């Protein structure tokens, strides 16, 4: 009897993209965008979404030349050589490590806040870091399948809690706060000086590019429509959700009121506490707490699973208990130690992740496409990008990279 292989539906790829890009990192958006506020933030998020969509489609074009199972290491090495491959490998590892640090920081902060809020017991941030690191490391050590199942539950819980919480807030949005009218604006208010510092946060908010090889592997070279549609729908959904998120936060918390949030470090626990102050209902405040915990926990598991697999492949650790223990140690110990020393760096880490992420999600794809179009006379799929667009994306990528470097050295104006 011939068993017919089931072709994955569009939903599988779309959910992969959505689950990857939408997570705890969205908590950093209102804080990062406070300087330019809602009108400017909406425009920049839209423009960056278009650019990230194009670079994602560029990777699809390149990846399809090599078929399912090929990843960045394969086609970067083949098309651009060993030096480029080393740079991309370092950037890839850096992004995953710094995101692991960011989500350990965010998770530990939210857990500490939740425990103190509902039990009255003060859980020190550093102790919370140890608990989170050991718990997540233990789950990853036990089974990648367990990580996947727990992540699925957390993602469902995250979206249910999100819409249950913020669909009510939409009716309390004040247009005057949203446009920062004179009644709410700070004295001598300015917006343009803060544009550059928002770019790294916007870039990382559409970080699905590492999943393009997974999509190609999922659908195969014959599933081009499902691959591209998954990316289109996932990116569009993320953009709309981010704008909705900014509407309900910036429409309820004025720009002036963001200053004390930022002054406290802008970590997730501080922001969740500020939003919690908007609710008069205890049950809604509880749902918000659940959302905060679900969001960062799902992001932590998803991001660290990618790093876990990358480390195992890089160091050729075996997939038995001993090998997975080594992998877990190399994966979680370095970011946990940094987080123990600097426990409140969630927002800053998300921004710094944009430094390396820009390399392999913005700058790398056009170079790969240029090389692939010279190498291969035909293509299964051609991204909607001519040479002018490819060059423009390279320039923009270089510009974004420069802004992150300037921000590291505190040479960019920051809203506070």
Swiss-Prot record:
Keyword Lipid metabolism: no
InterPro entries in UniProt: Amino_acid_transport_2, Trp/try_permease_CS, Trp_tyr_transpt
Record's bilayer topology term: Multi-pass membrane protein
Single GO MF annotation: aromatic amino acid transmembrane transporter activity
UniProt entry keywords in alphabetical sequence: Amino-acid transport, Cell inner membrane, Cell membrane, Membrane, Transmembrane, Transmembrane helix, Transport
Species lineage: Bacteria, Pseudomonadati, Pseudomonadota, Gammaproteobacteria, Enterobacterales
Domain of life, source organism: Bacteria
Any matching Pfam family: Trp_Tyr_perm
Protein name: Tyrosine permease
GO biological process: amino acid transmembrane transport
Cellular component terms (Gene Ontology): plasma membrane
Transmembrane segments annotated in the record for this chain: 13-33, 34-54, 86-106, 127-147, 153-173, 192-212, 231-251, 260-280, 286-306, 337-357, 389-409
Entry keyword annotation includes Transferase: no
Residues annotated as signal peptide: none
Localization per Swiss-Prot or TrEMBL: Cell inner membrane
Similarity comment: Belongs to the amino acid/polyamine transporter 2 family. Mtr/TnaB/TyrP permease subfamily.
């Amino acid at each position: 009897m011939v068993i017919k292989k089931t072709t994955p539906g569009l939903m599988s790829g779309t959910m992969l993209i959505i689950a990857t890009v939408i997570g705890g990192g969205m908590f950093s958006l209102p804080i990062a965008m406070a300087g330019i506020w809602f009108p400017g933030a909406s425009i920049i998020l839209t423009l960056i979404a278009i650019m990230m969509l194009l670079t994602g489609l560029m990777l699809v074009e390149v990846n399809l030349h090599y078929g399912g199972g090929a990843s960045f290491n394969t086609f970067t090495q083949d098309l651009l050589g060993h030096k480029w491959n080393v740079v991309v490998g370092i950037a890839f590892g850096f992004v995953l490590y710094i995101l692991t640090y960011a989500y350990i920081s965010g998770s530990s902060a939210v857990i500490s806040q939740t425990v103190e809020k509902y039990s009255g017991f003060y859980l020190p941030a550093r102790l919370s870091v140890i608990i989170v690191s050991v718990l997540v490391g233990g789950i990853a050590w036990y089974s990648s399948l367990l990580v996947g199942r727990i992540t699925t539950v957390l993602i469902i819980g995250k979206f249910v809690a999100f819409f249950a919480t913020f669909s009510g807030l939409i009716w309390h949005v004040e247009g005057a706060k949203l446009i920062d009218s004179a009644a709410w604006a700070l004295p001598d208010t300015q917006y343009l000086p803060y544009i550059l510092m928002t770019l790294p946060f916007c870039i990382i908010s559409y970080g699905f590019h590492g999943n393009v090889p997974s999509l190609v592997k999922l659908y195969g070279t014959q599933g081009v429509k499902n691959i591209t549609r998954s990316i289109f729908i996932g990116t569009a959904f993320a953009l709309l959700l981010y704008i909705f998120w900014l509407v309900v936060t910036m429409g309820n918390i004025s720009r002036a009121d963001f200053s004390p949030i930022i002054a406290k470090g802008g970590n997730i626990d501080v922001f969740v506490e500020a939003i919690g102050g908007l609710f008069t209902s205890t049950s809604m405040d509880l749902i918000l707490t659940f959302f905060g915990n679900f969001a960062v926990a799902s992001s932590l598991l998803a991001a660290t699973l990618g790093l876990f697999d990358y480390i195992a492949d890089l160091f050729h650790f075996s997939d038995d208990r001993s090998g997975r223990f080594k992998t877990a140690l190399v994966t979680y110990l370095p970011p946990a130690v940094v987080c123990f020393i600097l426990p409140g760096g969630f927002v800053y880490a998300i921004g710094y992740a944009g430094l390396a992420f820009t390399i392999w999600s913005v700058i790398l794809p056009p170079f790969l496409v240029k090389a692939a179009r010279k190498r291969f006379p035909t293509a299964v799929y051609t991204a909607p990008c001519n040479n002018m667009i490819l060059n423009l994306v390279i320039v923009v990528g270089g510009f974004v990279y420069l802004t992150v470097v300037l921000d590291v050295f505190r040479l960019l104006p920051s809203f506070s």
